Amino acid sequence: NQNELIKYEKIILSVTGEKRAEILSNEKELQNIDVVYTSNCVRTLQTAKYLLEKQNLKVNIDERFDERRPGKPNSDKVPDWYERQFFDENYKTEGGESQAEVRQRMSEAFEEVVKDNKGKRIAIFSHGNAITFFLLKWCKLESVNTNRNLCLSFNNKIVFNKRINSPDVFKITLNDKNEVIDIENIEFEDLD
């Protein structure tokens, strides 16, 4: 439904979300960024704005970095829909996107951004499920549970083992052939 999609894209950050975004902009790993890409969702732009202002950067908006279209989970008929979307890359809810579809569009956007910005430090602001599905291109899903805790590994090393939180920061390191050689979840100072 187009109206639902537009409403979803216009969701704004909470006051806490704004504070977390400002703290995130001070994260050491996010300094000296050359180029920034975001989805076209308002809350993603709001998360990026502090980094953009501090580093005097312009934003590049690409809707391919948008969150997965959730559709209608229909948990009455499919009570395990949340776990199923991780274990079956082609599963999708009515009107929603599958893991494979999200990964495809995220991968196309990522590869284009990397190709167009060779040798630059790139920050991409996207969304929890979309990023997770994208990371599954290289990571192994070790587990997911009904509490929405995820465990991901890369090259037999656990890189994420908790619930996706907004924002979460993942660093993807590429070699000179643009092959992924490392993935890590960057912890940052938070409100606690």
Positions of predicted regions on the chain:
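Active-site-proximal alpha-helix that buttresses catalytic centers in soluble enzyme cores
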Residues: N1-L57
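Short catalytic/ligand-binding loop motif for oxyanion handling, primarily in non-cytosolic enzymes
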Residues: N1-Q2, T44-T47, R69-G71, I131-F134
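Short glycine/proline- and charge-enriched loop/turn segments
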Residues: Q2-E9, E83-F86, C151-L152
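Phosphate-handling substructures
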Residues: I11-I12, E53-E108, F160-I164
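A generic secondary-structure signal
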Residues: I23-E27, E108-V113
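Glycine-rich phosphate-binding loop signature in dinucleotide/nucleotide-binding domains
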Residues: E29-N32, V113-K120
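Beta-strand elements within well-structured catalytic alpha/beta cores of enzymes
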Residues: Y37, N117-S126, A130
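Acidic, low-complexity terminal tails and accessory targeting/binding regions
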Residues: N60-I61, E67-P79, K118, L136-D192
